[in-house]
Every structure is written in structure tokens, then in C-alpha cells.
Amino acid sequence: MGTIQNLKSVFDYLEARNLGAAIIGLENYLTIHPNQVNSDRLHAIRTDCQLMADYWKRGFKDPQLPSLFQALLQRLYVLWGNICRSYAIGHNSFMSSIYMRQHMSARDWSPQNILEELETFVSNVAILELEPSQQREAKRRELYCQHQHDMNVLFDHILTSADLWTDGIAMAMEEILLSPTVDTNDQQLIVSAVMLSSMELFDIAKFRTLVHVYEKAVDERVRQRALVGWVLALRGRLIATIYPEQIDLVHHLLEDEDHCKELVELQEQIVFCMHAEHDTETIQREIMPDLLKNQSLRMTRNGIEEAEEDPMEDILHPGEQERKLEQMEASFQRMVNMQKQGSDIYFGGFSQMKRFSFFNELSNWFVPFYPNHPDVMEVLEKTGMNRFLNVMMEKGPFCNSDKYSFVFAFQQVISQIPQNMRGMLERGEATLNELPSEELESAAYIRRIYLQDLYRFFRLFPERSAFVNPFDMDGSFLFFADPIFSKTHLELFFNDVTAFFLKQDRLYNVLKLLSNYGEARRDFQFWMMYGYLAQHYANESALAFSDLQCYTNALEIQPDHERALAGLARAFFYREMYKEALETYDKLLTICPDKKSYRLNFAASLTNLGQYDEALKELYRLNYEFPDDKKVNRVLAWALVCEGKYEAADKIYEQLLATDNVYPDDLLNYGYSLWFSGHVDEAADCFHRFLKEEDYDPDFILENEAVLLREKGISEPEQQLMLYLL
């Protein structure tokens, strides 16, 4: 068995609480990959397990047995986790390199020393103000440069530390993350490192730390990073087996309705992040062309220049300038509205600006933007304190990662900008979409820009394959489907989140969400959403309920609900249960007697039941009221075919087929009409075109309307000859 498979099988045994098999699995692994420390730890676990078994088999009833067994299971998981972490680091060149960097630093990684270093930095920054002005800037650069290096290595240490945290380390790190004497930027970066480490390998101590920081943090930026951290670190498979404490931690949070609302917002914001590429395509295809063609700038070999105004333009095209401005403003406003709704409108542009050397450093993808970052200070020294740049970094609608990109790109293009525009920038007169302070400080905004930082990392970092991507389709982004939230207070918000995913047409995700509902929460809206899913989801075998069941259950709760009746009618119709469909559409017509779709489907049900006279009466009325409605004409034509009125049907089909976009079923049904009226060659031509469009086997022509063919007197030899022609 391969190494990965061996470690995977050990986890499967742990999940199944099969302690003995898990011990044997690790013993087999350590036989192939000997390590004295791990072997000693495993031997101690086996010894304790044997003592427990010996005591039990002698007939003693130990009330502490369940807790002792659980403790052994957790000790074995910790050992397994340490081995997995070491294996992952040793078999990935990137992870090995950052592990070696922090390992070779020879620093004291105890939480006490980390706290002391962080507090000393804050003190040194304060002392800077007492330095003579001629020395202050040089010392500032030196101080921040050394501190950023130290934070980079600390980030690497947290990520690649071979051992899972003990409870003591977790409590001490929690103190650091909540301390008012530690810089918030440092706390935010540490939280991101803890999150990234926990996503790679679940660590209950780190998870507990993130939950506690989310509960207790005063700084909203630290708090929101902790929220995202524990959510993305959730591992539902471990809940009931190895660490039931995870349930208690999460359920305690869910007692607060504000926490539940934040989780709803977070789930929706994650999805908006995942639409970044699609939103970029929309902007590039539909919005940017309008903005570019209406602007008065042009690119030259010397950079951007203002285009000269044509004095004849106002004479030849009066009002054209105003029209262009209105069109450009409308395009820009559309982009602003996309951003307000949660779209990541800047991903496309800034995704091309992640090749600066700054982004080679792992922790720089997570560090909050601050002007004293050594790389930023270097740029500001070259460009000067540009007011435009300052305002954009303070109030611009960008995530931290994009702010860094903006600064480095700004340095490269500033010399190519026209002089008059450069003057505007230096005076701070040309800023873009500044955000008010209250929005910048809001929890929702802080969380959104952090998610955008994460999305850029997992999509653009060159070594991203070394990490578990939560934004993948099978990643942890769909946390509302985690079993830990089932049958909790959060279920009160399940319908809102599921409806959101339905609007996004993410049916695969909707199925997972609906599967997480407890039976007590299967209310009217649940059955309506599941019914919609059942009628639109391709993989029927994955569904727990059929659309017929769902709409029937919904109507038991609200008997005369129009949408539920409409869903039930469709379910009957799709199953060719035309009598039941007819009865249901009849009920709908008592509620909405003039609704065209109900009248049309009522007539279609009559047609399929062979009640052609009644069907045609309604269809003629609909055709009179809606003469250009193709759906009405389509059903009318087919009813005429069934009634034997082929000439009238053919006229309608000729109209339907005289368009650029031919509906394949019109070819098929016109073919039947021609065949029944004796125009075999023309019928075969229609069938040929239909089969080519749909890529069906010729047998479909006979199987699709086998009953009608017999009713129309088409003999078996005639049917076989048609197949011969096809």
C-alpha cells in the first residue's frame, strides 16, 4: 500500500473509532518510515490502550472508560496529524523551503517570546517619535524592515510547525491575538496563518482559538479574519467521532442571532468571490468597450495622451458628446451597481498585477495594507507622497492585495501619465469611487475584502497547488451544508441561503444544502425549493425526493397555493399523467382564469388525452388572442395533426420553420404531419433534419409516437421503409 493510501486508511479507522486498526496502520507506516520520536509516542498510546483493554476484560466497569477511550483516540489523531504534516512538508519543495527558513532562524517560538517580540515592536514604534527628525526615517525603515521579516518567518512557522498545538499553546496564542498591546496588523496576519494551517490539517486547538477570537476580539478586522478562519477550517467528518468539542464550540456561537446573520452574509459573499472570473468577462465584454470608445484619451509610444477635439464634431453631430457621456456614465454606474451587489469587479484587472516580487513572499498575500511596509516605503520614496495614491489606499474600494498591486503599478506608470493629469493626481483631485468611512469600518466590508484577498491567493499564487483551495467546487466554501449546522438555530436561515443559491443557479450546491435540513425544518418553502430542484437537476438518482412528492407535500401545508399547484401540474405532465395534469390545470384556471400558460397546458393535456375538439376550442381562442405566440401555434398545429387536419397544420409549421432559429421539435412534428397526409419524401426530409440537429438514432422517429402511428394506420412495413429512407 502506498504511503498516502496508508495514512488515509489510518484516518478512516480513526473516523470509524476503530482504535486498534488505526494503531496497527500507524505501526505499519512507521516500519517503512522509521522515526524514533513518533514510534515512542505510538508505543505509549498502544501501552495505554492495552492497559485499558486488560482492565476491561477482567470485568471491571470503569465509568471513565468512554472519556479515556476518547482521549486515546484524540492522542492518536494528534500523532497521525503530526506525521501527515511532516510527510506533506517533506514531499513538497515549496513547503520544504519555508519550513527550512523558519527552522534555520533559531528563534524561540514559545508564545511567551512571540508576545514579547510583538510588544517590543509596538514600544519601539512609539519611541520613534522621540527620535530627532533627521534620524527618525532611517530608524523607521530599519525597524519595519526587520519586523516584517520576523512576521514573515513567524507566518511560515505557524504554517509548517510539525506538531499540532497543545491546549497551553492555544491559550497563549489566543492571549496574543486579543492583546491590546499587539499591533492589529500582526494579529491579522497570525490569524491568517492559523487559518491556513487549520485548513491543511484540522487542529482542534487552533479551531478553538479562532472561535474564541471571533467571540472576544474588539478589533473588527481581527474578528472577521477569525470568523472566516474557523468557518473554512470546519471539518464535519470529525465532529461526532474524534472531536465532539467542535460541536459545542459552534453551537454556542449559534445561540447569538447576530452570529447567524454574519454566517449568512459570509456564505453569500464567498459565492460572489467565486463569480470573479464571470464578472470579469461581463465587464470586459459588455462594459469596458463602451467606456473605452467614449473616452478622449489615446495610447502613444510616449504613454497616454489626451486626444485633440475635432472642431467639426459639434457641427456635424450635435449632441453626440452628451450622448457619449451619458452612455459612459451608464456603463460606469452598471459596474458600480455590480460592486454594491457584492461582485469582485477589480479581479480581472489586478489579477494581471501579481507578478511583482512582493508576491513571491507567502505572507504578503495575507498582510493588511499599511504604508510602512518596507516594499511600500521604497515606492513612496521614489514617487513622493502623492495625494491621489494616499486617498486611494485609505478610501479606495480595493482589497489589501490589490492595494499593494496598485502601489507597485503606479510607480511604473506615473512617468507616462500626461503632465496636466499628473498634477491632478498630486493634488488628489482624480480619485476613483471613494468609500465613506462608515462603510470601510463595517464588518461586511472588512469581511468582503479579506475574502477577495483569499480568492486572489488561491487563484493566483504560483505555489497554490500546495494548499487546499476552499473555493474549489468540492472545497469547504459551502459551509452551510456542513452537518454541524443541521438541527441548530442556524436552520432558521437555511431557506434564505438556499433561495440565494437557487437565484445563482447553483443547483449542485442547492442539493447539498437541502440535504442538510433536519426533518423538523422541512416546511413549505423547503418542499417548494426541492421541487424546483427536482424538475431542473440533471442527476435524478442523487435526489432524495421526486418533484411529485415535493409539490404534494407542499400542497398538504398550503392546499391552494398557485406555484405549488403549477409545479404539481408540470410533474404530472412530464410523467405523461395527463388526466391528473388536466385536473390540476383546471384548478389553476379557477385561480387564474386568464393566465396564458395554464390555458395552453390545459389544452395540451386535452390533446394528449385525445380530446381534440375541446383542445382546439381553447387553442383557437388563444391563437386569436396571441396570433404571434409560437408556443400557442406549436400546440395548435400538433392538435390539428392529431385531429387529422393536416393542411391547416402544415400552414402553421411552414410559418414556424420560416425563421432563422428553428425549433427541432417543429421539424419532427411537421414530418409526422407530412407522413400522415401522404407526403412521404418531404416527411423523410424533415426527419433527416431533425435527427441531424438532435443527434438521435432513426428508431426514435417510430418510438416517439408509436401509439399515434398505429392510430393513423401506418403499418409496420411502412414504418420499416421510413427507417430505410432515413
Question: What spans do the regions from the language model cover?
Answer:
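Residue-level recognition of tetratricopeptide repeat
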Residues: 35-36, 219-223, 490, 523-524, ...
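Single-residue signature of alpha-solenoid repeat helices
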Residues: 22, 510, 544-547, 581, ...
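Structural motif corresponding to the intra-repeat A-B loop/turn of tetratricopeptide repeats
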Residues: 16, 504, 537-541, 575, ...
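Alpha-solenoid helical-repeat scaffolds
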Residues: 364-570
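TPR alpha-solenoid repeat register
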Residues: 526, 564, 598, 632, ...
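Canonical tetratricopeptide repeat
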Residues: 229, 529, 567, 601, ...
